[in-house]
């Protein structure tokens, strides 16, 4: 019973704080607060310019491959384990996954910058 009361109290308090944080800034809105900010200078253009979807997809692909390569970093220390065969199988599986992913991106023209 005490756990249920604590959970309900915490949920209610968290919900109340979220609602306050959402509605309180909307009550005090003025032009300077809603204007774009560019390093202390007056903005050169609109802050809501559209960006290239191709750039976004290449950036996401880079992040995914970067995270997968980061999984390869502990491999030199993993060679010191007693079960070397399992480590080699896992490493080759990860490298194969990277190669297959790169080949797929290449065939789908996901790495092409121009169309």
UniProtKB/Swiss-Prot annotation:
Enzyme superclass (EC): translocase
GO biological process: mitochondrial electron transport, NADH to ubiquinone
The entry's keywords: Electron transport, Membrane, Mitochondrion, Mitochondrion inner membrane, NAD, Respiratory chain, Translocase, Transmembrane, Transmembrane helix, Transport, Ubiquinone
Any one GO molecular-function label of the UniProt entry: NADH dehydrogenase (ubiquinone) activity
Primary residence: mitochondrion
Reactions listed under catalytic activity: a ubiquinone + NADH + 5 H(+)(in) = a ubiquinol + NAD(+) + 4 H(+)(out)
Sequence intervals crossing the membrane: 3-23, 55-75, 86-106
Topology term for the membrane: Multi-pass membrane protein
Top-rank lineage group of the source organism: Eukaryota
E.C. number(s) listed in UniProt: 7.1.1.2
Subcellular location: Mitochondrion inner membrane
Gene Ontology, cellular component aspect: mitochondrial inner membrane; NADH dehydrogenase complex
Family of this protein: Belongs to the complex I subunit 3 family.
Assembly information from the UniProt record: Core subunit of respiratory chain NADH dehydrogenase (Complex I) which is composed of 45 different subunits. Interacts with TMEM186. Interacts with TMEM242.
Job of this protein: Core subunit of the mitochondrial membrane respiratory chain NADH dehydrogenase (Complex I) which catalyzes electron transfer from NADH through the respiratory chain, using ubiquinone as an electron acceptor. Essential for the catalytic activity of complex I.
Stated name of the protein: NADH-ubiquinone oxidoreductase chain 3
Originating species: Hippopotamus amphibius
